[in-house]
Amino acid sequence: IIHQDPVLSTTKLIAEPWDLGEGGYQVGNFPLLWSEWNGKYRDTIRDFWRGEHYTIGDFAFRFTGSSDLYQDDGRLPHASINFITAHDGFTLNDLVSYNEKHNEANGEGNRDGESYNRSWNCGIEGETKDSEILSLRAKQRRNYLTTLMLSQGVPMMLGGDEIGRSTQGNNNTYCQDNELSWFNWQLSKTQQALLTFTQKLIKFRQDHPIFSRHQWFFGREIHGSGVVDIGWFHPDGSEINDTEWHDSSNQAISIFLNGAEIPNLDNRGQRILDDSFVLLFNPSDEPLDFTIPESVEKTE
């Protein structure tokens, strides 16, 4: 068994936990020491940002490391390899630019590749010069990247997403050893802006350990700050109660992360302290006012 091997057990073991056939989808079923590409994270976050009536309970699980998949068997948040896109499927740019795959160039009659991509073209299929559509697509790319980098677990990016790489709607470019798959490092202003945004986002995550806790959230105070380690709220500032987690009409959410209640210790055995954050998520196409909850207003 791989994870019992004296050499391999000391390495990072990461599974792509699906295969063809019955029983091939094994997300959440690998043993201790293994991390997994979390396909449920990908699907939930894609649906959330394209406005599907997904329950906020599903979003909450994925955003906090998928404890429903990994906690019961003793694994920790880093067991979840979070991703929006990978080598199979749309690039991030194409995820917000195409509703349908366009794999005709592969010579298989567009039958190859995944047909259900949970994508949204923002109003026009494929390339466009419409400034409103382009602006919305840029915002959606930022939404996906920000959610990925602020989620508990290990973020994984598809190379090229940081510069808006496109394969023109082809989501299965295994046979395209040409300009369709190659990287073009001559960046446009839009691509350079996305690269800069992504670099700053990664630096922000690295600077704030609250976004990469080594333990699960408890939903209560740990170190006596008087405030819970995580809180979930409606836009009006009221706390989400147990009966509302599975109400698909509740889409927008604010999340409080308490930087004074991190259970991790640093390399010297000292408590880790960070800033506290209130994160606002609004997947609708309308602006929305949020109220900072009274219970967290006095935290730093």
Residue ranges and their predicted role:
Residues Y174-W185:
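Acyl/amide activation-and-transfer machinery of modular secondary-metabolite enzymes
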Residues K189-H246:
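Catalytic cores of secreted or luminal carbohydrate-active enzymes
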Residues F183, L201-P209, S284-E300:
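C-terminal accessory region downstream of the catalytic core in glycan-modifying enzymes
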Residues D130-I133, N184-T190:
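Short histidine-centered catalytic/ligand-binding loop motif
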Residues H3-G159, G164, N172-Q176, P209-S212, ...:
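Conserved alpha/beta catalytic core and glycan-binding cleft of carbohydrate-active enzymes
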Residues I81-N82, S181, I253-I255, T299:
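A broad, low-specificity signal marking well-ordered, structured residues that form hydrophobic/aromatic
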Residues W232-P293:
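Carbohydrate-binding surface patches
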Residues T167:
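Conserved nucleotide- and phosphate/pyrophosphate-binding catalytic cores
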